[in-house]
């Protein structure tokens, strides 16, 4: 199932991407990276794990291939002790941010879309919230079975709801 999303906020347009690859990131881009990083730094120790990096990259709108994730994982394990701090994350992501083209979803757009579904603001999308959002946002009335199927596909941890990370994965398919 596809959900309509807004335009990208931090990725460069095709015409200027080549010229801009060597420029430093702007303050707004660094803040975008910081927001994304903090979303995945659950214990607030200033680090994210190697395994969370792929999900974090997807949150930012970058869709790494399996090979890229394997290579990054090896680099992180060898050079960074299996964990990435914010500075290392910026260093890893800067070339990707500068090289990507328009049409990708940024963290804020993803978070805004999630909030449209999570109407009570508790950080989880329930069956009822999904059904209401589909009707309100897309004009689609899904059956309870169809709603359950959407949640089941997205609900990685099996708790019956869709949290932000699961939402990002669902939107990345």
Swiss-Prot record:
Keywords: Calcium, Cytoplasm, Metal-binding, Repeat. Its main location: cytoplasm. GO terms for biological process: signal transduction. Ca(2+) 3 binds at residues 155, 157, 159, 161, 166. Residues 28-63, 82-99, 105-140, 142-173 form the EF-hand domain. One of its GO terms (cellular component) is cytoplasm. It is found in: Cytoplasm. Retina. Ca(2+) 1 binds at residues 41, 43, 45, 52. Signal peptide: none annotated. One of its GO terms (molecular function) is calcium ion binding. It comes from the Eukaryota. InterPro entries: CaBP1/2/4/5, EF-hand-dom_pair, EF_Hand_1_Ca_BS, EF_hand_dom. Ca(2+) 2 binds at residues 118, 120, 122, 124, 129. Inhibits calcium-dependent inactivation of L-type calcium channel and shifts voltage dependence of activation to more depolarized membrane potentials. Involved in the transmission of light signals. May positively regulate neurotransmitter vesicle endocytosis and exocytosis in a salt-dependent manner. May play a role in the extension and network organization of neurites. PANTHER family: CALCIUM-BINDING PROTEIN 1-RELATED (PTHR45917), CALCIUM-BINDING PROTEIN 5 (PTHR45917:SF3). Interacts with CACNA1C (via C-terminal CDB motif) in a calcium-dependent manner. Interacts with STXBP1. Interacts with MYO6. This is Calcium-binding protein 5. The lineage of its organism: Eukaryota, Metazoa, Chordata, Craniata, Vertebrata. The gene is CABP5.
